[in-house]
């Protein structure tokens, strides 16, 4: 919008408080809040003074016209909304104040915002004019784009306008703490100076330069009150204001006095603490400088002893002098003079090698008397510039920040400009300190730097050979890792991140491009005149313009201060739209240490403390700049969150107010922590801590008890330590009133030593806050260290001691020093430190034999207090040792943690950090002959007797006694240890054994149990049923489970929605029993099974055994007989072979019962359950004999491997209560968080793909207008229950693509924010299977579609707010949601209603009644699952027409059009489908199972003997109570949820033969006994062995044009505990199995007929619903049939006898069945039990029967 003059509009009425402000349209890549520098009206002191002394009426207010000033519009015109921030109500610069109004009133009456207070923009008088100012405080300013219309008509006008530009006035920040007042005052003084009020600021002598006016005093008071709230003022400021609330000048005067009170001593201490020497200056100059500082400090009473001085000097040595830093390890009494002798020797050797001069050694007398001073040759120079020169020559242009570059390429440019610098410009204003600071760019989107002297401009530099810019926003065609070296005048390297093109669009509509380098490490953006000259552009300082050689004016030049600038508005921005991840490669020497690594190294201290420590050199070896702090703000350490979780913090200021000031080590605080229970006797149960009041130095001592003599020993030790080490005497010890402190023995001891005990008063916990906070901090650190490292709990005090060492070395933010510095000790050298629990290999110098390994695995604890070694815990020796003979265990294999801390061990960084110390140790350490046998004096764990660990990764194979094949030895596994096992061993309770963990094998005879109703396809139903006998012991391999889902709504593993439909029951699946019924051998069984696997290309053979189908009554008509034959004809029923009696050998008949040992093995047995052992079997040798290594379940989980664990409290789990409690399977997280996918992902390729997915998701969110970008809300203004947390999750889909999704935390969403009655509907699996079956029979085309970001198309009705994504950097703001974000409770329902409406209204579809998400019209059928659509049509063009309509509204992607006549492969909702139109369809999950099953942490047997059935009959789950540890119980329940969840998902999809076993185990999720776990492993093993099986469908070849829908029903009477019956049904459409159901009967049946009636009654409703669906999708006639193997049930259904039943419940069911059968034209027929394929749904079957019933439909 073009700016308009004030004269075009009438004056605004006097009654308006504020007026609308117009603004110019800005470029799309420019911040709409940015204002051109030319829009700021010039202001000076003269005009201020003049305006303050005159009065002008509003009508006579004259404002000079300026085309760059925005003029007001009438009040009726609404203010424009150009950005995400609302326009503030403010008055324009050309608007006069209403008459009779003065903004100088009481402060509470001020109607304007704080940033309108500066007299820089309006004169301080009643008739002042208010300027336009950015609406967001602190928003950087920039110039408008060339399209905004702000062009210059000629060079003279441009010169006049631009030269009048003044710098902006930014308001000071708000004061938020009394401690921040000194820093705030500096910014406030600078604000006054920038507002041309510097003359009123008091000088050093306390007097201002000029007298302050009343208006200025009012302005001073008002701004001080607004920006410095009274509650955050220091006490001394409040005291001044209490006397005179307007005396701001006195506050400023006193603040300036405090700022000027920095003494020479403080400067000398800072200089001494930051010494740096590398030999670039003479050694005697360095010595003179240091000795002068030390002498001055000593003369002023600050004593610097030789030890401290040497440590400070050596810490600053670098280069060839660096090795002297470690001489303190060899010479503890070295003096400063001796140290400088070594420095002089090295320096003179260097000079001698350069100049061939003899070495020179100085005498100490020379050192004392030498008072020469040397100039530091590396001191940066500030070049004086002459801005008055107006020569047009290029060589005399303004010079600024000259740099030189060298490119490592054939065309080398090594221009070196002398007398130039990249140091900050010499500022006219001494308070503009921030302008010279080194800048670091955290993002690449900044178009401006608010700290620039002239923001939004480039500094013209005649000396720079290259153009440098800090922001990548304007860089085109950027490429990272440029091979370019850039140096300044002092030959210091400037790191370059990228190189690209800088494109200009000048006002004559010409475009020009020059090369530019990107670096954030310069003070200003530099534009090289040399590079401009190369493209025929010169700078004319006469006219102050950039022009071409022909005189064409391109852009004006701004003269600001002593330099010349050009606006950035002529730069064309690049197409960067979102922040990018900085992957700029740096060399080894410049690569920074990751913050999480330093965080873990320093005992998990917070970032603020670590930064203070590095700034103040309390941590040595590297500086603050060596750490990458980019992730410090948002980084959340999981171990800290777990270990340091607390309710609230202690009250601050807890020390007594009447406490006097003491010298160091005269006033101590002490407290005792403990006891820690369940530890071995050798480990301490308590610790006592001491804290010095003055220095905050801490000590900790272990205690085994709280007896008087134990406490007295500690007091004696610490008092002697303080007296000898610090030459101090303790005067007061503060403690609580515990009996350990108030006893007579300790009281007499303190009295004897002249120490005053200071006890806390009653109910005065605040007085003991120092000791309480220390104990809490140390305990938090202890929990965090143990959690992170995985070390056993008996090492808890080692974690306490490690934390104490680190805490004493970290600087306090308040005192800026560490406790060690206060105590006069040197800082902690971090290169000598290892992370707590770091895996190491310790050298064993005295092994048991010469061939015994020399390395012992161990875990580093903390540095030794008595040597230069390290305390290391050796689990194999059950002790800790003090040694230096260790090597850090490297690689990904050595990770200790359970939170996927792949990036937190940082082997490479650790090597760099400890390299120098390791080399020093290697060259200087004294070999200790008995190193490993010397235990630490505080090695309180040394004598702990540990039980040996159970073997890990032991593979065994059970061999049948009749099997001639010897067992596998598996030597490969014995040589290879699982990588995940390299972890600190957990503790194992020596008192826990199988006898008190495993339940007994007795079964209750009179149980009582209630029922749980079942749902389709098994899973969650309680089944107190025996499980089948396991087949054979499988070889085991350890693995981890990390399933990858297909998407975030439906995955190929399982989801919460789908498990609600997958509750499939099972019958007796395994277990143990004292008696085992003999079975036929495997070989004989195989001979008796007739395999009839049908060919895929040919149609299945006709069933020729129809004579086995026995009708209930003879059909009276040929039609009924044909109907029966038609129903039976195409069913996949087994072909029964002719039977012959089986004779067993005589010895077998005499075989006594064999006691089973299956409950002690991993899979339930030591041999093949189908094999026989004869009495006459001969004994075998040890090699040939059957062996079994019993592997406990605990040894498979590497996280639970513990070397020692005290007795824990047991939890009793009752079977009935556990089974009752099972409601649903808890979904397992299959996605990655941001830190896992990107931040700490060491897989570079995968990380880049996730970054790309992240950017794609952010762009999609912005494109879909997901939230309101016009307004941002403060968190305090919004009801917390309407605020939804959000996060990014990442996932790798099955097709290999990487996915990122921004989701809401709906799991913690408040119920008031959504309608609980709304449902998120998805297509039922039976509907999908029915559609697929009809597609095969009718030669349909199948098209698969995907709608990207489907939920974002649905509007949200509720008022909800989310926190902005992290890249926006607005942590304290909220944005309002406009779309249904993924994860919200109502998002699924909103999307369903949206897409349903579109399909019906725009696509002409209608939803099938009773089957949600199934839509149809005359040609097309659609199955909808969230954003996946499956289209079925006989005409492919009909599908394409639907796709075209969908693309008009939604981003629709065609996954598979399905137009080929050959075999087409689909991945539909987790099913891997192979479909050849008109021939066959195969449904399986081989690829998915091959990927997921090995990750379940279950031992699989990929090459050994395969299981032939998921279980065997004859064994039962024990009913006894399960006594188990609490933690172990939770862990096993979690594992059961994971295993059964995946198995339920697979069984629900297509493995209907497993539903019985899945249902049974699912009911025992909360009863994870050893037996239940073994049976679950056996089921997973069978799924692995049969992962290649598929559900095979062939195209139906009917004799009649009818659809045949059949349900086969079966029930097992009383085969469940407590006389419950198992029922099962299988549903077939045109001979193809489309679904199955297995569950336990809800009522207790009293006969087999009642059980069968119950099963039939469960099948008929679903059969009728499927019939309706088939008729809607296919208009052919349908024949419905029901098959059961119960003649009595069929008789009752078909009978017309209405006599009373003996049981009213089943009588009601029977009568209902009669009505349903007769009313729905349902045919009921008998099927022989041997051919009833539903038998697999109700009971465990022998291998032969199981194969016979399933190999016709799944193989």
UniProtKB/Swiss-Prot annotation:
Q: Which GO terms describe its cellular component?
A: cytoplasm; nucleus
User: Which residues are Mg(2+) 1-binding?
Assistant: 671, 736
Residues marked Cleavage (site): 401-402, 582-583, 1217-1218
Q: Tell me a Gene Ontology molecular-function term this record carries.
A: DNA binding
In this chain the RNase H Ty1/copia-type domain maps to 1610-1752
Q: Where in the cell is it found?
A: Cytoplasm; Nucleus
Nuclease as a keyword of this entry, yes or no, is: yes
Biased composition range(s): Basic and acidic residues: 1044-1053
Compositionally biased residues, Polar residues: 1-10, 48-60, 127-152, 402-421, 1005-1017, 1031-1043, 1054-1082, 1101-1111
Disulfide pairings? none
UniProt region (Integrase-type zinc finger-like), positions on chain? 583-640
Q: Where is the composition biased (Low complexity)?
A: 153-165, 960-969
* Disordered: region residues: 1-93, 126-173, 352-421, 956-1087, 1092-1111, 1130-1186
Outline what the protein does. Answer: Capsid protein (CA) is the structural component of the virus-like particle (VLP), forming the shell that encapsulates the retrotransposons dimeric RNA genome. The particles are assembled from trimer-clustered units and there are holes in the capsid shells that allow for the diffusion of macromolecules. CA also has nucleocapsid-like chaperone activity, promoting primer tRNA(i)-Met annealing to the multipartite primer-binding site (PBS), dimerization of Ty1 RNA and initiation of reverse transcription.
Domain characteristics, as noted in the entry: The C-terminal RNA-binding region of CA is sufficient for all its nucleocapsid-like chaperone activities.
Q: What is this protein called?
A: Transposon Ty1-DR3 Gag-Pol polyprotein
Record organism: Saccharomyces cerevisiae (strain ATCC 204508 / S288c) (Baker's yeast)
**Chain's gene name:** TY1B-DR3
